[in-house]
From Swiss-Prot:
Source species: Synechococcus elongatus (strain ATCC 33912 / PCC 7942 / FACHB-805)
Sample GO molecular function, one term: ATP binding
Name of the protein: Thiamine-monophosphate kinase
Top-tier EC class: transferase
Biological process, per Gene Ontology: thiamine biosynthetic process; thiamine diphosphate biosynthetic process
Binding site for substrate: H54, E268, F321
């Protein structure tokens, strides 16, 4: 089929092409049917990606838009301790957008979903002057093993998986804000365009739980930055924190101050930030190895303080990205 515009194909011409990405048993009806595993509860997460706000041609090829749309929502499931059950994708697009662009969106989405064993189970199409993707992810969770933001306690260790700041470095390189050298450049661009939701950590939490203890894991993902994650957990749990280490990219070729700001406030790293009792945290570290580190501790005073060898500062939500603000 030639690379026609969406207006030339029309909705009825598009639907069979897009339904091919869904399992056969989920095609053709008005809604999807899911059967919950015994003893599991449903977890639902929604996300919207708007062209010019969340992605642009300069930084994100269509396949990467699809991958990121899936990854962001799968990361929310991981942050709740859930496993994926399915995803829906609704799109509103300009009528002159090309079919190849839309197909690449679905191909990127499909690659991500297959990697994490999650089916595409539905969606919708509409016309709009601005390209917009609305994703809903559904997952299953054992109600006795939910991760909450509100359960951190004084004395908990704060753990962060992976590296923070890479996505922001990649975005800055693509926007021309700075030039990264190899191998950091490829690592940073990959982190921005193809983030990896940490669903692998969810089963390890159960495996590392100390015998005879009650399930209590506080956490969330770091989609809006490491500082935001710690601050949101502390706000919900009515506690504070001291951060004494940061999981920065391993490089000596980039300014340290920028690395720190990227890790704290850059966002879109889609790692997990978890608060656990010290013995539980230590057991999880032994399973994750270099994929995680302890970055601080929960304190009673409701302030989040960064305390590194070369700086001390109070962290604030005002420094990170927020919709409807001008900074």
């Amino acid at each position: 089929m030639s690379d026609r515009s969406l207006s030339e194909l029309g909705e009825q011409g598009l639907l069979p092409l897009l339904q091919a990405f869904c399992p056969a048993e989920q095609r053709g009806d008005d809604a999807a049917i899911l059967t919950p595993p015994a003893g599991q509860q449903l977890v639902v997460s929604s996300d919207v990606l708007v062209e010019g706000i969340h992605f642009s041609e300069a930084t994100t090829p269509p396949a990467a838009i699809g991958w990121r749309a899936a990854a962001a929502n799968l990361s929310d499931l991981a942050a709740m301790g859930a496993t994926p059950a399915g995803i829906t994708l609704a799109l509103a697009l300009p009528s002159d957008r090309r079919l190849s662009w839309l197909q690449q969106i679905y191909q990127g989405l499909d690659r991500c979903l297959k990697q994490y064993d999650c089916p595409l189970i539905g969606g919708d199409l509409s016309r709009s002057p601005t390209a917009t993707l609305a994703v809903t992810a559904l997952g299953w969770v054992n109600p006795n093993r939910v991760i909450r933001r509100s359960t951190a306690q004084v004395g908990d260790w704060i753990m962060a998986t992976g590296t923070h700041g890479l996505s922001r470095l990649g975005l800055g390189h693509l926007l021309g804000e700075w030039t990264l050298a190899e191998p950091l450049r490829d690592q940073a661009i990959a982190a921005h365009q193809a983030p990896k939701p940490r669903l692998d950590v969810v089963p390890l939490l159960a495996r590392s739980q100390p015998a005879g203890t009650v399930w209590r894991v506080a956490g969330m993902d770091s989609s809006d930055g490491l500082a935001d994650a710690v601050l949101q957990i502390c706000r919900a749990s009515q506690v504070g924190a001291v951060i004494e280490a940061l999981p920065l990219p391993a490089t000596t070729s980039f300014d340290r101050d920028r690395l720190i700001q990227a890790a704290l406030y850059g966002g879109e790293d889609f790692e997990l930030v978890l608060c656990l009792s010290p013995d539980w945290a230590q057991a999880l570290l032994e399973l994750l190895g270099e994929q995680a580190q302890v970055i601080g501790q929960i304190t009673e005073k409701p302030v989040v303080q960064l305390r590194l060898s070369d700086r001390t500062e109070i962290l604030s939500l005002d420094r990170g990205f927020q919709h409807f603000t001008t900074h």
